[in-house]
């Protein structure tokens, strides 16, 4: 196959992997009823007037299955950390305890678990669409290269077959990631 087709396929592969990584990152922040440091990934603390990621002003740990402990590097950061976690729309109620903040993770109701599963499936669908859009763009590039005479018809056909397999594998992997997260959310 021509190098143009190889370059297009390499780009497709890289963009699909990036989409899978993005899905994993987004789903890591979804609450499952068990403590996970990723729950607080999007929490920003007012650090001397600058919104700063929580993990840049404190040490985070999970000593128990339903508890996150936040140990700020400066004691003065305890109230802003509590406020940031409370305001983070995570349904969490942090409590200060001398020089640290305890964040108990409440159990999820069955109804809430089902809502979360819907969100997880929706995120999976969004990422499947992204993978298909990447395939469509790559297909258009292959067709243009064939029309311009940069690659032969046979090479274009082989590239399109590889592209479809790559896309199918990406969609299958998204289904696996979503199924694993669903199982995690529904587990009591």
Swiss-Prot record:
SUPFAM superfamilies: Ribosome recycling factor, RRF (SSF55194). It comes from the Bacteria. GO terms for biological process: cytoplasmic translational termination. The keyword Transit peptide does not apply. It is found in: Cytoplasm. GO terms for molecular function: ribosomal large subunit binding. Keywords: Cytoplasm, Protein biosynthesis. Gene3D superfamilies: 3.30.1360.40, Ribosome-recycling factor. GO terms for cellular component: cytosol. Its main location: cytoplasm. Responsible for the release of ribosomes from messenger RNA at the termination of protein biosynthesis. May increase the efficiency of translation by recycling ribosomes from one round of translation to another. HAMAP family: RRF. Belongs to the RRF family. This is Ribosome-recycling factor. It comes from Anaeromyxobacter dehalogenans (strain 2CP-1 / ATCC BAA-258). The gene is frr.
């Amino acid at each position: 196959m021509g190098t143009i087709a190889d370059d297009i396929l390499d780009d497709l592969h890289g963009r699909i992997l990036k989409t899978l990584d993005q899905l994993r990152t987004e789903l890591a922040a979804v609450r499952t009823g068990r403590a996970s440091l990723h729950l607080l990934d999007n929490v920003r603390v007012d650090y001397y007037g600058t919104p700063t990621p929580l993990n840049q002003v404190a040490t985070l740990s999970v000593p128990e299955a339903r508890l996150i402990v936040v140990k700020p590097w400066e004691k003065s950061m305890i109230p802003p950390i509590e406020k940031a976690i409370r305001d983070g729309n995570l349904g969490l109620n942090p409590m200060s305890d001398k020089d640290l903040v305890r964040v108990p993770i409440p159990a999820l109701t069955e109804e809430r678990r089902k809502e979360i599963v819907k969100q997880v499936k929706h995120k999976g669908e969004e990422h499947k669409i992204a993978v298909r859009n990447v395939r469509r763009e790559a297909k258009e590039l292959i067709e243009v290269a064939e029309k311009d005479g940069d690659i032969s018809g046979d090479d274009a056909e082989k590239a399109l077959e590889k592209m479809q397999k790559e896309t199918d594998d990406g969609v299958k992997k998204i289904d696996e990631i979503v199924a694993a997260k669903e199982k995690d959310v529904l587990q009591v």
